A protein has these predicted regions:
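Short glycine/serine/threonine/alanine-rich loop segments
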Residues: 48, 77, 109, 163, ...
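N-terminal helical cap/lid subdomain that shapes the substrate entry/recognition surface
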Residues: 7-17, 22-99, 119-120
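Asp-based, Mg2+/Mn2+-dependent phosphohydrolase catalytic module
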Residues: 1-12, 105, 118-234
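Catalytic-core regions built around general acid/base machinery
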Residues: 99-108
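Hydrophobic residues in well-ordered beta-strands that form the structural core
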Residues: 25, 113-115, 190
């Protein structure tokens, strides 16, 4: 199994990581804070109650990909007003993870963050986790305000970084965000239990044919991988 895993990634020179619930455990309960703030923002600015805010968020997620994308498309909001508010969260639950940091550092090639959040928030989270050395941190603004799983988001990131998708691997906790990378030829790694959507429901197996690898433990997966991969010339 170890040799098969190494063969599957031997060609990879670009490693792309999602942020929330991928580079820290979901049990750190950071995203629930963000989620609550999103609902509060809708209640405050759209003058709706909690039930309607939840309904709108589900609708925006299904139609536009994210709550922010829906608000921009249907209400023309300033994205920074929203992002600065919902990402003002307590990061004290996050702890440095030197083992994960070392595993990422050992991967041969470039390491990229691609998140639907903004770069300022991403940098705060990475600092709290003790993760550094990424070649690029690309957020929703760098993706032209197109969120994953929108094809335009991936195209914008690829244009910004400059890489061949067949030489890349992407790590994500949301199954649907790996469909486009898979179609472009990337290795796709689902991190965690494989839940998706605002309700956190597990995805049925037939809906995950675009997942090439799965792991409940990103650190252990990367450690096994890095052990057998040789450095690449960039």
């Amino acid at each position: 199994m170890q040799q098969s895993l190494i063969r599957d990634f031997a060609h990879v020179t670009v490693w792309i990581f999602d942020l929330d619930d991928t580079l820290y455990p979901p049990e750190d309960a950071l995203f629930p804070q963000v989620s609550a703030k999103m609902s509060e923002w809708l209640m405050r600015h759209l003058h709706v109650d909690a039930t309607e805010a939840a309904r709108l968020r589900d609708y925006y997620w299904r139609k536009h990909g994210t709550t922010l994308a829906g608000l921009m498309a249907e209400h023309g909001i300033d994205p920074w007003d929203f992002l600065n508010d919902v990402h003002d969260v307590d990061l004290s639950a996050l702890r440095p993870d030197p083992v994960l940091a070392a595993a990422i550092a050992r991967l041969p090639g470039r390491k990229i963050i691609h998140t639907n959040a903004d770069c300022i928030y991403a940098e705060r989270v990475l600092a709290a986790r003790g993760l550094s050395g990424f070649d690029a941190i690309l957020g929703i603004g760098e993706a032209g305000w197109h969120p994953k799983p929108d094809l335009r988001a991936y195209d914008a990131i690829r244009a910004a970084v400059g890489f061949d998708p067949v030489e890349a691997a992407m790590f994500e906790d949301a199954p649907r965000n790996l469909a486009v990378p898979f179609s472009q030829g990337m290795r796709t790694v689902l991190v965690g239990p494989g839940c998706d959507g605002p309700k956190g429901l597990p995805m049925p197996p037939e809906a995950m044919a675009h997942i090439t690898h799965r792991t409940p433990d990103l650190t252990e997966f990367l450690h096994r991988l890095a052990q057998g991969l040789a450095p690449v010339a960039l």
